[in-house]
């Protein structure tokens, strides 16, 4: 048993999609979340800068005495997860392998699509992980650089957003049977993405899949929070506007949250 919180980091609000799933599956666990919205999105940035920023977020979470860190950002996972996991003495999870595994299980026709930031797509990490498990599957990857900024701005269902999603995803329509949402921001656009891709395409939320791995590791290391540990005190931090973060966060999590601005 370990009553310390689980730490989550992301380039912005996208990691809240993972938090929402954790609150649903593991409602007794406490959360500390840091979103670097001031420097979002990470996708277009060079790898060394992503590495530097991610380590800053990790070190911030370590000051909060977390028992586990979840890199709830596909771009950061692709660039620096292995390094962070190797250097810390607490469990560190990324969101890519769980998403790849889930896509393989869901694909009926062996044609998997991956959408993500330019860095995630450029890294080719999803194709590698999928082919490590099943080399016969076809993988089509597409960078969607405009999606995360739309989510960060709170434009989740505007006509402009719908047009951008349609025009961006058009090359994949009719070509895949499963689509990995390879950025934790993208589930906030899920209804629009599903509408564009069609009802038969399975959408894979890499962040939500990650929560199953969190549960496994909590049990394996015997660090579940005690059921009698007292009330939960979730803490949310952002490097940008706490008001904007709270507005998106409360809409997505369907509960009131307290958000604090921090400088890194």
From Swiss-Prot:
InterPro entries: Asp/Glu/hydantoin_racemase, Asp/Glu_race, Asp/Glu_racemase_AS_1, Asp/Glu_racemase_AS_2, Glu_race. GO terms for molecular function: glutamate racemase activity. It comes from the Bacteria. Substrate binds at residues 10-11, 42-43, 74-75, 184-185. One of its GO terms (biological process) is regulation of cell shape. The keyword Cell wall biogenesis/degradation applies. It is an enzyme of class 5 (isomerase). Pfam families: Asp_Glu_race. Keywords: Cell shape, Cell wall biogenesis/degradation, Isomerase, Peptidoglycan synthesis. Transmembrane segments: none annotated. It catalyses: L-glutamate = D-glutamate. Its EC number is 5.1.1.3. Pathway: Cell wall biogenesis; peptidoglycan biosynthesis. The active site is at residues 73, 183. Belongs to the aspartate/glutamate racemases family. NCBIfam families: glut_race, PRK00865.1-3. Provides the (R)-glutamate required for cell wall biosynthesis. This is Glutamate racemase. The gene is murI.
């Amino acid at each position: 048993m370990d009553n310390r919180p689980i730490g989550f980091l992301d380039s912005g609000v996208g990691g809240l999609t993972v938090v929402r799933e954790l609150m649903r599956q593991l409602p007794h666990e406490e959360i500390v979340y840091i979103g670097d919205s001031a420097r979002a999105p990470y996708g277009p940035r060079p790898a060394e800068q992503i590495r530097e920023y991610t380590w800053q977020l990790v070190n911030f979470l370590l000051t909060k005495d977390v028992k586990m860190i979840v890199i709830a950002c596909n771009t950061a996972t692709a660039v620096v997860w292995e390094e962070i996991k190797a250097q810390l003495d607490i469990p560190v999870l990324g969101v890519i392998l769980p998403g790849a595994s889930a896509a393989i299980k869901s694909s009926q026709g062996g044609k998997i699509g991956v959408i993500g930031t330019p860095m995630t797509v450029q890294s080719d990490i999803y194709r590698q992980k999928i082919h490590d498990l099943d080399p016969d599957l076809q993988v089509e990857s597409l960078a969607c650089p405009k999606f995360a900024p739309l989510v960060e701005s709170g434009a989740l269902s505007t006509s402009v957003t719908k047009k951008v999603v349609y025009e961006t995803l058009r090359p994949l329509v009719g070509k895949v049977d499963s689509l990995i949402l390879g950025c934790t921001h993208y589930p906030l656009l899920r209804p629009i993405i599903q509408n564009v891709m069609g009802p038969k395409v399975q959408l894979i939320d890499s962040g939500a899949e990650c929560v199953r791995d969190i549960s496994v590791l909590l049990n394996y290391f015997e660090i579940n929070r005690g059921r009698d540990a007292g009330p939960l005190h979730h803490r949310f931090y952002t490097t940008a506007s706490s008001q904007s973060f709270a507005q998106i966060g409360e809409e997505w999590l369907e509960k009131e949250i307290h958000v604090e601005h921090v400088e890194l």
